């Protein structure tokens, strides 16, 4: 079987539970070789984000050139992009190198609700990046921000917003329903072929730091092994559920701790 080379384009987390660090752990846990391009140095921990230092867009582009000119990249995950010029740099390089299997975790809001992208960056993201992306993975607040619409409060509203996002030009949409008041935590996959509902019981743990990063990285790592997104989503969600179920065995920080990426080994 061909070895999978996976790239993450994202910000950092020195506490190890989210961002680049979580992505690389996820790639390794799922049998993919991980490469990384850093878009922002983030001072954060299990209690929140303290500060963000944005990498110069030219240097983000230089990192992308270094990887794409030398390494066969089979699959890519995009996370925090921080500003308009970084969105533009990433979109341009994806187009230049004809990169396939791109999963975009639409990191747009901090847990506090504060925006992590300016309105101009969101506009560039819609026009330049989304048409090149194979799958986006917004939660409900992120979907609302992308659509400039109210937060979906029901599953029906979630369905309507998922369809609207697909119409914006990306290949597929995985709408995450964790913010709904529903014991099953429904997710919906929207593709050009149809729609599919996924459910999983809520796992009772406070340690959910980096779950969005981890899921999108898992989707990227697993996509080359499947012929469709539905099977990829099913395997990624199952693996993440196991990582969440073992999260309380870790002892990391005094806030919202990380999931256990290496639960299968220790």
Protein language model features and the residues they cover:
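Conserved phosphate/ATP/ADP-binding segment of small-molecule kinases
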Residues: 119-195
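Nucleotide and nucleotide-moiety/phosphate-recognizing core
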Residues: 88-96, 171, 194, 229-231
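Short, small-residue alpha-helix embedded
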Residues: 145, 206-229
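Conserved N-terminal subdomain of the carbohydrate kinase-like
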Residues: 2-8, 28-111, 115, 262-265
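Charged C-terminal helix
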Residues: 3, 54, 230-266
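Acidic-glycine-rich active-site phosphate/pyrophosphate-binding loop
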Residues: 1-2, 8, 19, 183-198
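Short pre-catalytic strand/loop immediately N-terminal to key active-site residues, enriched for Gly-Thr
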Residues: 9-15, 195-209
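Phosphate-handling active-site elements
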Residues: 30-35, 196, 222-236
């Amino acid at each position: 079987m061909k070895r999978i080379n996976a790239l993450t384009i994202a910000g950092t987390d020195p506490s190890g539970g989210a961002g680049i660090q979580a992505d690389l752990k996820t790639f390794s846990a799922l049998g993919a070789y991980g490469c990384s391009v850093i878009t922002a140095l983030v001072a954060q921990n299990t209690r929140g984000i303290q500060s963000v230092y944005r990498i110069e867009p030219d240097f983000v582009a230089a990192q992308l050139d270094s990887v794409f000119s030398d390494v066969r990249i089979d699959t890519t995950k995009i996370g925090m992009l921080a500003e308009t010029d970084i969105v533009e740099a990433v979109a341009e390089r994806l187009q230049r190198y004809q990169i396939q299997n791109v999963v975009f975790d639409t990191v747009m809001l901090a847990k506090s609700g504060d925006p992590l992208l300016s309105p101009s960056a969101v506009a560039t993201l819609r026009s330049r990046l989304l048409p090149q992306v194979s799958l986006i993975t917004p939660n409900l607040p992120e979907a609302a921000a992308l659509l400039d619409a109210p937060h979906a409060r029901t599953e029906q509203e979630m369905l309507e917003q998922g369809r609207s996002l697909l119409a914006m030009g990306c290949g597929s949409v995985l709408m995450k329903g964790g913010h709904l008041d529903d014991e099953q935590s429904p997710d919906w996959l929207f593709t050009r072929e149809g729609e599919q509902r996924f459910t999983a019981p809520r796992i009772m743990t406070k340690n959910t730091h980096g779950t969005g990063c981890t899921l999108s990285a898992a989707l990227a790592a697993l996509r080359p092994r499947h012929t469709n997104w539905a099977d990829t989503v099913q395997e990624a969600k199952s693996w993440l559920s196991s990582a969440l179920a073992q999260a309380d065995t870790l002892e990391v920080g005094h806030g919202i701790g990380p999931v256990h990426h290496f639960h299968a080994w220790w």
